[in-house]
């Protein structure tokens, strides 16, 4: 089927449908009245969302306000079209997790087609000969292997089993720099690594405790001694240079202030110390190293005992979504 403006309009309406519950629907909020429709205040026609099909190959988008970064925003997959017949065949218009994404059912319009998926084993894609720029696609296919252990992944690369890997253990960086200088590359990466507090339960329902934990983190030591991959200490939630944004540093390392804030909370609650805090992260050697490093900082500065709890990815996502955590790993990637 040809990709038309109707496919985009249908896809935008679907992702904004409040019954679908898409996590990235807000990416389309720059469209006029999109938030009103998504939040259930008005029906699609009544809301007059700023999406209009002028003809099969002309789509008109009207914005709520001027958005200087709008063209860059369109690179996000939330703006990509979905195949309407496939969506409707599998009842996926208002449902997430139906069979429409299985290899035998999925229909896309990118340079590759999903050809196989063995859970926890491999994802395979093959070249899409119907792609508009197929002549520029040099690869016949790609296999993606989900490997949790970074050393296993590195060994698979060095043996020739993998052609490319993005995960390297911090403990191996110096060795790889020396032995494989032409293979190891550090590339700019737009993202922020952070921890999420559960604000609905003690002790993080109190701002003083949250600030104390934040001030007790030595970000310089974390990136220099633990991560070692050229990361920058995060002093704001949004990384510098995002869409020309120059953030004002908000986070700093101040152990004395951290101790005072926590002591104020403990005195008010009549406590000698905080009960053990459970820190949840999805299974990964890298996440474990960061968690252990922060555990040490919080124990040394605040006298807090941290219990580390790792979970399989889907279980982790479900637990966080349900609010079943005290402190959890998180990330934001642009």
Where are these regions (language model features)?
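Periplasmic binding protein-like
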Residues: 163-164, 299-334
């Amino acid at each position: 089927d040809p990709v038309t403006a109707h496919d985009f309009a249908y896809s935008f309406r679907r992702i904004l449908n409040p019954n679908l519950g898409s996590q990235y629907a807000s990416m389309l909020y720059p469209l006029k009245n999109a938030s009103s429709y998504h939040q259930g205040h008005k029906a699609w026609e009544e809301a007059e969302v700023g999406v209009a099909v002028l003809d099969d190959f002309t789509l008109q988008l009207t914005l709520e306000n001027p958005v200087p970064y709008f063209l860059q925003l369109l690179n996000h997959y939330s703006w990509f079209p979905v195949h309407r017949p496939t969506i409707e065949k599998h009842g996926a218009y208002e449902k997430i997790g139906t069979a429409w994404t299985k290899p035998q059912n999925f229909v896309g319009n990118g340079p590759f087609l999903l050809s196989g998926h063995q859970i926890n084993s491999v994802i395979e894609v093959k070249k899409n000969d119907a792609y508009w720029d197929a002549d520029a696609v040099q690869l016949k296919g790609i296999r993606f292997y989900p490997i949790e252990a970074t050393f296993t992944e590195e060994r698979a690369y060095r043996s020739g089993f993998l052609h490319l890997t993005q995960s390297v253990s911090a403990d191996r960086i110096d060795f790889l720099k020396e032995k494989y200088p032409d293979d190891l590359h550090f590339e700019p990466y737009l993202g922020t690594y952070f921890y999420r507090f559960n604000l609905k339960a003690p002790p993080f329902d109190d701002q003083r405790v949250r600030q104390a934990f934040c001030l007790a983190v030595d970000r310089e030591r974390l990136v220099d001694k633990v991560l070692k991959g050229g990361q920058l200490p995060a002093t704001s939630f949004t990384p510098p240079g995002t869409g020309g944004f120059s953030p004002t540093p908000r986070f700093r390392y101040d152990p004395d202030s951290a101790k005072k804030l926590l002591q104020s909370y403990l005195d008010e609650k009549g406590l000698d110390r905080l009960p053990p805090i459970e820190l949840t992260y999805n299974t990964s050697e890298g996440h474990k190293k960061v968690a252990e490093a922060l555990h040490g900082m919080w124990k040394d500065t605040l006298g807090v005992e941290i219990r580390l709890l790792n979970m399989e990815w889907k279980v982790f996502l479900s637990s966080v979504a349900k609010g079943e955590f005290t402190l959890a790993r998180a990330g934001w990637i642009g």
